C-alpha cells in the first residue's frame, strides 16, 4: 500500500487528494466477495434470483435466505456482509410499514429505496462508524408498475430494467446487456436469469440451489419452491 494512501484510508470522513474515500471503496470490495444476485423486469412484474452457496455441509441449507420480503409487494436481495444486510432489511421493513400505515396505499418503492440509501450514505460521512459492506437490489410493484432499483455502500441508487450485484456482477451484466429483452413472459425471464447466473460461474462450478422470487401486478410476493427451481436448472 502506498504511503499516501495509508494516510487517508483509516479516516472515513477525509477525502484523499485525488477525491477518493477509501473506506467506501473497501466496502464495495466486500460486496464483490458476496453471492451473485440479479433482478429483472418482465412482462407484468419483476423477479429476483440469487445464487446460494452453502459453505459447509453442516449448515442447514433452508436457513440461508438471500431474498428478503420487505412488504407484500416489495422484496430485496443482498450481497456482502450478512449482518449489515440484516440491519438494512429490518430498516426497510419498518420504513415500508410506516408509509403503509400513514398513507394506506402501496409502498412507493423509489421513496423506500431513497430512505435506505440515506441511511447508508450517513455512514460515509461521520466519524466513529464505517460504511455498510452490502449492496441491495429492491424489486416490487407500486402505483407506477414494476420497479427495480439497486443501492450500493455509498448510498448511490439507480433504477434498472435488469441489474446484478455480488462477485459475478460484471459477467451477469455483460450477459444481460446482450440477451435481455423487455416484456418477456415470466418463465422466459426466469430461464434467462438462470443462464445469466450460470455465466458468472467458474469452470467446474454448478448452480445448485438458487433462490427465485417474483412479484407481479395484482399478485403478492412469491418465492419459488425447490421443485419449481429444479425445472429451470
Swiss-Prot record:
Spell out the SMART domains in the cross-references. Answer: Proteasome_A_N (SM00948)
Q: State what this protein does.
A: Component of the proteasome core, a large protease complex with broad specificity involved in protein degradation. The T.acidophilum proteasome is able to cleave oligopeptides after Tyr, Leu, Phe, and to a lesser extent after Glu and Arg. Thus, displays chymotrypsin-like activity and low level of caspase-like and trypsin-like activities.
Q: Which PROSITE patterns match?
A: PROTEASOME_ALPHA_1 (PS00388), PROTEASOME_ALPHA_2 (PS51475)
Annotated protein name in UniProt: Proteasome subunit alpha
| Record localization | Cytoplasm
Q: What's the impact of mutating residue 82 to D/G?
A: Prevents PAN to stimulate gate opening
Quote additional remarks.
Answer: The configuration of the closed gate contains an opening large enough to allow rapid entry of tetrapeptides but able to impede the entry of proteins and longer peptides.
Q: Which GO terms describe its cellular component?
A: cytoplasm; proteasome core complex, alpha-subunit complex
Query: What do we know about how this protein assembles, alone or with others?
Result: The 20S proteasome core is composed of 14 alpha and 14 beta subunits that assemble into four stacked heptameric rings, resulting in a barrel-shaped structure. The two inner rings, each composed of seven catalytic beta subunits, are sandwiched by two outer rings, each composed of seven alpha subunits. The catalytic chamber with the active sites is on the inside of the barrel. Has a gated structure, the ends of the cylinder being occluded by the N-termini of the alpha-subunits. Is capped at one or both ends by the proteasome regulatory ATPase, PAN.
InterPro entries annotated for this entry? Answer: Ntn_hydrolases_N, Proteasome_alpha, Proteasome_alpha-type, Proteasome_asu_arc, Proteasome_asu_N, Proteasome_sua/b
Name the family: Belongs to the peptidase T1A family.
Superkingdom, natural source: Archaea
Q: How is its activity regulated?
A: The formation of the proteasomal ATPase PAN-20S proteasome complex, via the docking of the C-termini of PAN into the intersubunit pockets in the alpha-rings, triggers opening of the gate for substrate entry. Interconversion between the open-gate and close-gate conformations leads to a dynamic regulation of the 20S proteasome proteolysis activity.
The keyword Cytoplasm is assigned to this record? yes
Q: What SUPFAM superfamilies does the record point to? A: N-terminal nucleophile aminohydrolases (Ntn hydrolases)
Kindly state which keywords UniProt assigns to this record, in alphabetical order: Cytoplasm, Proteasome
Q: Where are the transmembrane segments?
A: none
A GO biological-process term: ubiquitin-dependent protein catabolic process
Q: Name one GO molecular function term.
A: threonine-type endopeptidase activity
NCBIfam families linked to this entry: arc_protsome_A, PRK03996.1
Write out the PTM section of this UniProt entry. Answer: The N-terminus is blocked.
Q: Does the keyword Transcription regulation apply?
A: no
